[in-house]
Amino acid sequence: WTVYHYAKEKGMEICRQKYGKFVCDILDYIVKGGHPNLFLHDNGLLYSNGKERVISWMNAVVDGRPVNPRSGYLVEFNGLWYNGLRFAAALFAEDKEMASKVEQWNAIADKTAESFVHTFLNDYGYLVDYVDGAMSDWSVRPNMLIALSLDYSPLDKRQRKRALEVVTRELLTPKGIRTLSPKSYGYNPTYVGSQTEREYAYHQGPARPWLMGAYADAYLKIFGISGVSFLERMLIGFEDEMSQTCIGSISELFDGTSHSLNHDYWTLAGELYQRWFRN
């Protein structure tokens, strides 16, 4: 993702010269089974075991075990995987010596795209959070936003628009994106209580400002320039926050209904993203 945005800024040729080998090495490492917890299945999707340890940014732990044991095919992992494959193929498209690699990456991406839609897109129009064997987690969570925000998507525009409508309706707040829909089981919008109580609530409803970056990207991909005014109205509310609580910054998370909590590196990353977007 980062290298892709570097390529958008500097151009494909400069990016290929500087980071081309790095991109190729990462994909080869995964395809050849080098990663200890990313397994490429025949359907083109990446499988990860998260039953006993956290493997995603939803990393709350109680008594050494994940509060949210996301395991199997994770929606954001596979959205990023598809994006990476298509980007690498585009990066080396003009390099004849890499023709066989490009063909391999595109062949895997074709499988990934078909399997992604079949695996994650449900009848209600949004993306399930993860799938492990016969078990699908239908909780409405913001991880689908990462997949929706990418330039290379397995979903067509109509599918992305329908999924984004669910995010807007159930997860969007004036202070960020909820980590869980109020309609989903286990929703807890407030991060209060003992350490254990707070860990259980951490990704169960409080809103995260940093996710507004992914939301903005996904929204603009659907609505284009006509969506800018709506996003500006959403983001303008953060200006007052920078003079309260976390002076010069933004709180890490807010109640799902919305009071600010402590500052965090996630939000710093989100702030940088927003500044880039607004420029």
Regions picked out by a protein language model, each given a short descriptive name:
Residues 50-73, 191-202, 252-258:
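Acidic/His metal-coordination segments adjacent to aromatic residues that form catalytic metal sites
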Residues 73, 88, 222-223:
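A generic structural motif
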Residues 135-136, 199-207, 220-226, 259-267:
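Short, contiguous acidic/charged loop-to-helix segments that flank catalytic cores in large enzymes
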Residues 13, 71-72, 99-102:
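Active-site oxyanion-binding pockets that recognize sulfate/phosphate
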Residues 1-55, 74-78, 82, 206-220, ...:
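Aromatic-rich carbohydrate-recognition surfaces in CAZymes
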Residues 177-212:
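Generic long, charged, amphipathic alpha-helical segments
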Residues 68-76, 131-138, 199-206:
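Short, solvent-exposed segments of well-ordered alpha helices
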Residues 31, 35-41, 80-191, 233-270, ...:
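Catalytic cores of carbohydrate-active enzymes
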